[in-house]
Amino acid sequence: MTLDTAEKQKLIESHQVHPTDTGSVEIQVAMISERITKLSEHLQGNIHDYASRQGLLKMIGKRKRLLSYIKGKDPKNYQDLIKKIGIRG
């Protein structure tokens, strides 16, 4: 459910805007999307884990807000990010 350092570094390298970028919106969306994927897999086997389900819904909401920010700021970048991460926009 959490990302280890190697996974975070891999996501940062694949979504960097510039060489020293570690926290741009694109990276934040990529990390949240990866956490959502892991948490969804966890909830497949642990149906009654309501606390994790609530955390999942909060993460989905945060990702949605970040994506709407990117969509308003740079629509082309938004489309590229959606395709790269593999989620519906």
UniProtKB/Swiss-Prot annotation:
GO terms for cellular component: cytosolic small ribosomal subunit. Gene3D superfamilies: 6.10.250.3130, S15/NS1, RNA-binding (1.10.287.10). SUPFAM superfamilies: S15/NS1 RNA-binding domain. The keyword ATP-binding does not apply. Keywords: Ribonucleoprotein, Ribosomal protein, RNA-binding, rRNA-binding. It holds the Pfam family Ribosomal_S15. SMART domains: Ribosomal_S15. GO terms for biological process: translation. The keyword Secreted does not apply. GO terms for molecular function: rRNA binding; structural constituent of ribosome. InterPro entries: Ribosomal_uS15, Ribosomal_uS15_bac-type, uS15_NS1_RNA-bd_sf. One of the primary rRNA binding proteins, it binds directly to 16S rRNA where it helps nucleate assembly of the platform of the 30S subunit by binding and bridging several RNA helices of the 16S rRNA. Forms an intersubunit bridge (bridge B4) with the 23S rRNA of the 50S subunit in the ribosome. Part of the 30S ribosomal subunit. Forms a bridge to the 50S subunit in the 70S ribosome, contacting the 23S rRNA. NCBIfam families: S15_bact. Belongs to the universal ribosomal protein uS15 family. This is Small ribosomal subunit protein uS15. It comes from Prochlorococcus marinus (strain MIT 9515).
